[in-house]
Amino acid sequence: MSTIKDSNLASIGKDEVNWAQRQMQVLEDIKLDFEKRKPLDGLNIGACMHVTKETANLMLTLKAAGANVALCASNPLSTKDSVAAYLAESGIQVHAIHGVSNEEFFEHLNSVLDTKPDITMDDGADLVSLLHTDRADVPVMGSMEETTTGVIRLKSMEKNNKLRFPVVAVNDSDTKHLFDNRFGTGQSAMDGVVRATDLLIAGLNVVVVGFGDCGKGVAERAYGMGAKVTVVEPNSVRALEALMHGYEVKSSINAAKIADVIVSVTGNMHALDKQHFDVMKDGVALANAGHFDVEINLEALKEHSSSVDRVRDHVESYKYNDKEILVLAEGRLVNLAAATGHPASVMDMSFANQALAAEWIKDNYKNLEPKVYTLPTEVDLKIAATKLGLMGGELEILTEEQIKYLDSWEHGTS
């Protein structure tokens, strides 16, 4: 039994899912193969992910492989109710409604775990966390993690000998983090900022906090829209890289003083805190494109504000001392709450990794330790080659002579 908003939205969801499928041909090829082989036949798969049209295509691929699939949302504001309705109609157990309370959010997580999944999929390690605390009663073969934030949490668990089953860090596959994180986050985060605020980005001072793959993407897209980009980054190598890309590189305090828009992409807590609010300009807009809603210290902001008013869909105005600070999407993921998330074409590769990881866990879990794993390189290369061809690219083929030269040590300067 699913928990959704309105089953009558299914026809709308079907159109949205089918539109995304047009741009997800790598995943579609896997789905056709899975339909023939049924590699996940009889397995229960529990997923905690953003309930979007792209995710729907992954869920339908797993179902085509023979799995019984249950899905809940990884973010209360990212659920597309029409997509949830269509998936429920298609035989996927769905527990997701846009805008649910925290209590309902965790009820939905538990509903997925009540299906006794053999394999779980996470977008932030919420299911895995429950499987190591309140729901340690549920045995699983293994799990998968989609995000940088989730992988950090899992590697910490492994380091402290707390992880009790193998997990595939899908985020660490090149065909995920080099494309989804950079190009997907960059485009969708700036799309969310523009949709929420209707700002002209050209000429604004846009501060990007964090210069990992996601931060690089946001900085590139903001710069491409005409912004004056400043990067905040604690890692000296990344900071130097940002500088050589042509961006200003400043401390968070000095960057906060000049910002018109700040996008936090750190995966860490309180990247924007009271000391930053104190020096910000009147009318600054704050957005989170990292993961959890802790990057902006909203408790401190609210505590020291005389009023909080919703002035526009996805925009809250905090009256902080004698100025206004605008928070987008309640400090949650701006690209999913205020826009439609990553383009389907880039999620195609990420979800191809997820689908293949499910089969890999099923085939190998008996020989795996409770550690964080990365999919084999050949999986990455196969996904990349397929996507390259679909986008009209051509792969260079080395000659036998060139391959032999690269494998030898005898040849040098003659």
Predicted regions and their residues:
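A short helix->loop->beta-strand "cap" motif at the edges of active sites that frequently abuts
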Residues: 66-68, 92, 138-139, 163-165, ...
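Adenosine-phosphate binding glycine-rich loop
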Residues: 9-26, 40-44, 52, 165-203, ...
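Glycine/serine-rich phosphate-binding loop and adjoining beta1-alpha1 elements at the start
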Residues: 1-40, 74-79, 84-204
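Glycine-rich phosphate/diphosphate-binding loop of Rossmann-like nucleotide-binding domains
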Residues: 49-67, 176, 180, 184-259, ...
